[in-house]
Amino acid sequence: MQHYVTPDLCDAYPDLVQVLEPMFSNFGGRDSFGGQIVTIKCFEDNSLVKEQVELDGKGKVLVVDGGGSLRRALLGDMLAEKAAKNGWEGLVIYGCVRDVDVLIQTDVGVQALASHPMKTDKRGIGDLNVVVTFAGVTFRPGEYVYADNNGVLVSPSPLKMPE
């Protein structure tokens, strides 16, 4: 597992990276993560999140535009454990998570806005691999996202940690 330091990436690639507004917190068991972006756009319905974490996620980060909802959790312990089992590097969730005491022990990166104990509805509503924009940054499927306890950033191409 590669360790990323976002300040070092910003220093090494200042013209390449876009930094998200500082509203995310680390809820996962990994201090840092990065990989190729897979996007979901949904609102208080995590059906597509469930579908995606059941697939092979090696080298990928699931970016979930949950509309910034603070009323439901788009990720909990069971889905985080599936994501870890299937090799996902991490998830960036513009929304809430729950089961935070288990998430912090799960080998997957999780950046989200807050915790909330209420689960979502499962209506099968949402869009997969569409361009999404939140926190002042646009996420395009196939681009790259990197996160640590300092922040989250996006790059159009893969980045290497400076030596």
Curated annotation (Swiss-Prot):
Lineage of the species this protein comes from: Bacteria, Pseudomonadati, Pseudomonadota, Gammaproteobacteria, Pseudomonadales
GO biological process: regulation of RNA metabolic process
InterPro entries assigned to the protein according to its UniProt record, in alphabetical order: RraA, RraA/RraA-like, RraA/RraA-like_sf
Needed co-factor(s): a divalent metal cation
Annotated family: Belongs to the class II aldolase/RraA-like family.
Key word Metal-binding present: yes
Organism: Pseudomonas putida (strain ATCC 700007 / DSM 6899 / JCM 31910 / BCRC 17059 / LMG 24140 / F1)
Domain of life according to the entry: Bacteria
Any GO MF annotation of the entry: metal ion binding
Entry protein name: Putative 4-hydroxy-4-methyl-2-oxoglutarate aldolase
Positions of a divalent metal cation binding: 99
Keyword Lyase: yes
Positions annotated to bind substrate: 76-79, 98
